[in-house]
Amino acid sequence: MAGVSSCLKYSMFFFNFLFWVCGTLILGLAIWVRVSKDGKEIITSGDSSTNPFIAVNILIAVGSIIMVLGFLGCCGAVKESRCMLLLFFIGLLLILILQVAAGILGAAFKPEYNRILNETLYENAKLLSDNTDEAKDFQKAMIVFQSEFKCCGLENGAADWGNNFVEAKESCQCTGTDCATYQGSSVYPKTCLSLIKDLFEKNIIIVIGIAFGLAVIEILGLVFSMVLYCQIGSK
């Protein structure tokens, strides 16, 4: 009867440890985005009925599941447990299928995501010239955002602030040569809406890269777990 390959056994452990680390990173990043004060205020303010944190909550769940599967894979390899390895294989296969389905749906519904993002930000632009308590809270967050990212307004630049421009004037002030002029003041020519869209597009590329790398690890995990499962059964 053939024995269990030590090389395969510890390769399985190593790749599952990487898998567990990936789950930890996804969970940590998703939680950070979820509790980030400035980002939360900017994204969730407004009258949009769409919850922009649905995707973040899904990532928190996915990160937790990946951590559990990584643990099952590591323990199943070290303890040579066929039950743990089978649970790991089934769970990992389901995640890979869901990941591929999510990628296809994400590509198909990208225009819808852009529409939701535009609607949310356009609604928020109205808050800049408003005087309600909700608007004031959003304006404070926008002033911080403008100062940090060197942009002004959301849709129409400094004009979005209306009569509230005096309060936002300092955060919009441009000291370079490539500046726009509004009410006699030099302001940043770039709107925060265009900046947020640029950041969104760049982050999508990063997410795609992470998803591709994770898929490679998942496929290796499936192969190693099934081979190890068969070797343990033939002892």
UniProtKB/Swiss-Prot annotation:
Q: Which CDD domains match?
A: TM4SF3_like_LEL
Q: How does it assemble?
A: Forms homooligomers. Interacts with MEP1B. Interacts with integrin alpha3/ITGA3. Interacts with RICTOR and MTOR. Interacts with ADAM17. Interacts with ECE1.
Q: Where are the transmembrane segments?
A: 13-33, 53-73, 85-105, 204-224
User: Annotated Gene Ontology MF terms?
Assistant: integrin binding
Q: Which branch of life, at top level? A: Eukaryota
Concerning its family, UniProt says: Belongs to the tetraspanin (TM4SF) family.
Query: In UniProt terms, what function does this protein have?
Result: Structural component of specialized membrane microdomains known as tetraspanin-enriched microdomains (TERMs), which act as platforms for receptor clustering and signaling. Participates thereby in diverse biological functions such as cell signal transduction, migration and protein trafficking. Promotes ADAM17-mediated TNF-alpha processing through recruitment of ADAM17 to tetraspanin-enriched micro-domains (TEMs). Forms a complex with RICTOR and integrin alpha3/ITGA3 to mediate mTORC2 activation and AKT1 phosphorylation leading to cell migration.
According to the UniProt topology, which residue ranges lie Cytoplasmic? 1-12, 74-84, 225-235
User: Which residues, by range, are in coiled-coil regions?
Assistant: none
> What species was this sequence derived from?
Mus musculus
Check the record and name the SUPFAM superfamilies matching this protein. Tetraspanin (SSF48652)
This protein's encoding gene: Tspan8
Question: An example of a Gene Ontology BP annotation on this entry?
Answer: spermatogenesis
Q: Name one GO cellular component term.
A: cell surface
Primary location class = membrane
User: Where is it located?
Assistant: Cell membrane
Membrane-side (Extracellular) residue stretches: 34-52, 106-203
The entry's keywords: Cell membrane, Glycoprotein, Membrane, Transmembrane, Transmembrane helix
Keyword Transmembrane helix belongs to the record? yes
Q: Which Pfam families match?
A: Tetraspanin
Keyword Chaperone carried by entry: no
Q: What is the recorded name of this protein?
A: Tetraspanin-8
Q: What happens when the gene is disrupted?
A: Tspan8 deficiency results in a lower body weight in male mice fed a normal chow diet, and in a lower gain in body weight upon feeding a high fat high carbohydrate diet. No significant body weight differences could be detected for female knockout mice. In addition to the body weight and bone density phenotypes, male knockout mice also exhibit lower circulating levels of free fatty acids and glycerol.
Topology with respect to the bilayer: Multi-pass membrane protein
Question: Carbohydrate attachment sites?
Answer: N118
